[in-house]
Curated annotation (Swiss-Prot):
Signal peptide bounds: 1-33
Highest taxon listed in the record's lineage: Eukaryota
Key words of the record: Carbohydrate metabolism, Extracellular matrix, Glycoprotein, Glycosidase, Hydrolase, Multifunctional enzyme, Polysaccharide degradation, Secreted, Signal, Xylan degradation
Species of the source: Medicago sativa subsp. varia
Name of the protein this chain belongs to: Beta-xylosidase/alpha-L-arabinofuranosidase 1
Amino acid sequence: ANTKNREPKVSSVFLCFSIFYVTVLLNCNHVYGQTSTVFACDVAKNTNVSSYGFCDNSLSVEDRVSDLVKRLTLQEKIGNLGNSAVEVSRLGIPKYEWWSEALHGVSNIGPGTHFSSLVPGATNFPMPILTAASFNTSLFQAIGSVVSNEARAMYNVGLAGLTYWSPNINIFRDPRWGRGQETPGEDPLLSSKYAAGYVKGLQQTDDGDSDKLKVAACCKHYTAYDVDNWKGVQRYTFDAVVSQQDLDDTFQPPFKSCVIDGNVASVMCSYNKVNGKPTCADPDLLKGVIRGKWKLNGYIVSDCDSVEVLYKDQHYTKTPEEAAAKTILSGLDLDCGSYLGQYTGGAVKQGLVDEASITNAVSNNFATLMRLGFFDGDPSKQPYGNLGPKDVCTPENQELAREAARQGIVLLKNSPRSLPLSSKAIKSLAVIGPNANATRVMIGNYEGIPCKYTSPLQGLTAFVPTSYAPGCPDVQCANAQIDDAAKIAASADATIIVVGANLAIEAESLDRVNILLPGQQQQLVNEVANVSKGPVILVIMSGGGMDVSFAKTNDKITSILWVGYPGEAGGAAIADVIFGSYNPSGRLPMTWYPQSYVEKVPMTNMNMRADPATGYPGRTYRFYKGETVFSFGDGMSFGTVEHKIVKAPQLVSVPLAEDHECRSLECKSLDVADKHCQNLAFDIHLSVKNMGKMSSSHSVLLFFTPPNVHNAPQKHLLGFEKVQLAGKSEGMVRFKVDVCNDLSVVDELGNRKVPLGDHMLHVGNLKHSLSVRI
């Protein structure tokens, strides 16, 4: 029973709890989820509430919260430190379930949200790894906006909460990570832009008032969390040993952007330790960075059962009361779980934590609910009160799910006269493979019930007549069933083979040990390709990269597409690309490594940078020195695109004060904290020409290589833009480059520096040298 978020430890205690949980749900669905619209300050039920300051929305959030917490007993405050917050009936405050999920659509994972005959499903978008491949920030926000509309609609009929523990913005550091599919990939800039964009889509109200929230998003899992269960190493006890340079250069930027640029309402701390300290009990990470440096306006929540984990699994404290006190004093406001509810009272009695710290924590929680309008009375009279079942799974929302999948799909190989196929010329199409008729597989994890499914087979059959053979009994493919598949491929005009993974191969609590196609899938692909009469298109459905070197070099396999987990409309999107209704424009958001990489690099080594002394090859395109199967940013379209730099400086002079030490010393870099960084920016203008006849979206990726100082990245994404180009047309793209933000690197101590010397800018095959001098 996977009832706990991020699938917690399977222990006898957990199994007992699961049985209890299911029993309670069956007998009384009022316990764990909203069953009618839940809100405070209901004048119809209790006229006294109109006299309470916390119900007066003409007051500031701060004043309202202050009025509320003064009225609460210590026990009532403690009852509001857990995800299943208790009711305070004397003040007209109902119980509230904080835990809902919306990773790529409203999900019924977590007790705060469920479906019913009133709303049987919600729009399931592609998994974030595929959405990220679109390199389209406006798409990230558009999806968030649709998801929050559907969430509000479900809240209004008592089926959902207002607090969503999404997105997952951890860096996809290692190809084996089972949860990489949930993330925007391996690059800090792309992940940062995704975080801010998706969060804005979820949270922003129509009037743009940043003090109000449409729904409350949550960026997780803070921080350096990317090992679940690898060769017996569990996330509950894993100590991520991370250098200050890697922390500030790789792992922290998405969270910083989420808080500062996205103005997110919540951050979730992770299970793992970082350099010996559990993240949920690290005051430097929580109070120091999230609240202090980044100024979070919202609440900090633990990953589910993390407070219990740091006592029971990590043995970080001697008692449960100590665990409760340590986390609250470190800056935790809300516990996904029951530990704070059970043990905070005892911690107060033992003098381990003071009531003021508890008041501070619940104040952050209540402030979030105030911003959501939870204390403004009847939601039907509030903004978004008109949303309801009619606004879920609308044709427009379902079309956006299809469009998101199309924009993300990546074309990795395309021989002449392969794709696109002509629906007029193809009279028979063989559709083969364990994911060829996938439905549930397409929506990945943290999923909801979709509006409907279109499998690859259904999508392709809408274009041409098909014959189908799965070729494997399941995705694990222990025994390939090649005969039927080979037979239909031998006579068909073209063959589509849909292979890859599913949640039995890569998932939460399940990291891969190899990155080859599972079981006998490779044998199936080779043998079918060998007898195929026409072009063979290999379609890979997966969250992580696969070593498909064999398919790259096999001339019989004429095209390769990676489709991630493409969501409810994935099959339609795949067919749109294969038959040329849509020109592919996705680019890989992560490196695809050879199998040899995972054979020699332990998943537990957190170092990003290569170490020539030990032969350690480094991680991600920014630092990895070895061979790749496919590289970050790879992706083709059906035509070619030419880039041309129209305007870019060759020299940038940094104005330094006369007495600056670098005027006399041989400085290799300048500190970005100094005054010389203010307003130091320039523009780069690029022309982008579509040489093909077919209209196309195109992602322009601007990289730079800094001078070789501070063990800097060998290449780094500086910016990206999606442009729409008609056939044979030209467009202009402008990048505004802030020298100290965009051309800086993180030094060995975690400080940002601008390297002096020659920086190389790259776009496609173009290179432009830019000198930064004093």
